[in-house]
Amino acid sequence: MNRNDPAAFALGPALLFCPAGRPDRFAKAAERSDAVILDLEDAVAPADKERARRVMTDHLSGIDSHTASRTVVRINPAGTAEFDADVQVLAGYQPEHIMLAKTQSAEDVQAVHRRFPDAQVIALCETAGGAAAAHEIAGHPATSAIMWGAEDLVVSIGGTSSRHPDGTYRDIARHVRSAILLAAAACGKAAVDAIYADISDTAGLSAEAADAVGSGFAAKACIHPSQVDPIRQAYRPTAEEAEYAHALLDEAAHHSGAFQFRGGMIDTPLLRHAERIAQRALAG
C-alpha cells in the first residue's frame, strides 16, 4: 500500500448498531446496513447480558458466510467480568470482526487477539485514556480500525454533554475526533466516525457524514436504520463530483507535472483527491 493511500475497510460506509438481545432486529439490521454491530455492551442491561449472549450466539451459528463477513460483535471492556464472559461464550464462534468497547491501550487489543487470533479488531476509543493512547492502539497489528465515541468520552472527563445547544461538538470532542483520525492514518488503519444520536435530525446527520467523508473517515456508525441512507449518500459522490474527477484524471494523463484545469492549478494532492472520489463513485 502506498503510504498516502487510505486504509482499506470493507465494512462501510454505514455501520448499524443493534442490541445483541434483540434477535427480532438482527435480519433487518443486516439487510439495511453495510455492516451490523451486535452490541453486548451499552445496548444491553447488566441483568440481560447472559440472555443476550445466548440469543446472539444462536444467531451467529446460523448465518451464512456473507452475513458473517458483515457482522461485528461489540464486546465489553477488557479487564471486566463481562469481557471474560463475552469471550468465553464467543470462543466457539470465532467472529471475523470484534469491536472492543472502551479500549484503553494496545494491551486491551492484545487481550482480544490472544483469544481470537484471526479476528479483526475495531478498537473503540471513547475514554480519556483511550484517546491519549490512540496511536499505540491503532498501531497494534490486530487493529483493523479505530472508532471514537463522544458521550462516553465526555463522561470520562467529567463533562455533561459532547455538543453545544446548536448541535455542534464541543472543542474536546472535536479534538479527539481529529486525534483518532490522525492516529489511524499514521498507522495505516481505517477510522470510523461516531454515531449521530439525534435520529430526527437528518440534516445534521447528513452534514456530519459529509464532513466525515471529506476529512477521511472510512465509515460512520449509526443507531437507527433511517440513518443508513443519509450516510451512504454522503459517501457517494454526486454526478458532478464524479464527472469532474474522471475528467481531471483523463486530462492528467496528458501532463507530467502541474497543469491548469477548468480555471484551477492542479498538482499531485488534488489528483489524489480525484482518484479517491473516482474510487467511491465506482464503489457506488
Locations of regions flagged by a protein language model:
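Expand to "…catalyze enediolate/carbanion chemistry for C-C bond making/breaking, isomerization
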Residues: 1-284
